[in-house]
């Protein structure tokens, strides 16, 4: 059975664990239609456009 030869120091242990719980910042791009910030590869929440065409209905268009 494999057994560690030396005790893992708290510093080494914490460095190993640090990458698992690391939070990466959200990357935002601007919508080509309205200029609102949106997530990449997602339809715009403000106007509903994605890839140059209307992808989903928004509250403003559904009300009219």
Swiss-Prot record:
One Pfam family in the UniProt entry: Ribosomal_L32p
Protein's GO biological process: translation
Membrane spanning residue stretches: none
A GO molecular-function descriptor: structural constituent of ribosome
Keywords assigned: Ribonucleoprotein, Ribosomal protein
Compositionally biased spans, kind Basic residues: 1-10
Keyword Ribosomal protein: yes
Recorded superkingdom: Bacteria
Secretion signal, residue range per the UniProt entry: none
Gene3D superfamilies: Single helix bin
Annotated segments matching region Disordered: 1-22
Biased composition (Basic and acidic residues): 11-22
Assigned GO CC terms: large ribosomal subunit
Keyword presence, Ribonucleoprotein: yes
InterPro entries listed in its UniProt record: Ribosomal_bL32 (IPR002677), Ribosomal_bL32_bact (IPR044957), Ribosomal_zn-bd (IPR011332)
Similarity-based family: Belongs to the bacterial ribosomal protein bL32 family.
PANTHER family linked: 50S RIBOSOMAL PROTEIN L32 (PTHR35534), LARGE RIBOSOMAL SUBUNIT PROTEIN BL32 (PTHR35534:SF1)
Annotated protein name in UniProt: Large ribosomal subunit protein bL32
């Amino acid at each position: 059975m494999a057994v560690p030869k030396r005790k893992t120091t708290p510093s080494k242990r914490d460095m190993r664990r640090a990458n698992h719980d690391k939070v990466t910042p959200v990357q935002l791009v601007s919508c080509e239609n309205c200029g609102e910030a949106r997530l990449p590869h997602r339809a715009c929440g403000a106007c509903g456009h994605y890839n140059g065409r209307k992808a989903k209905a928004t509250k403003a268009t559904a009300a009219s």
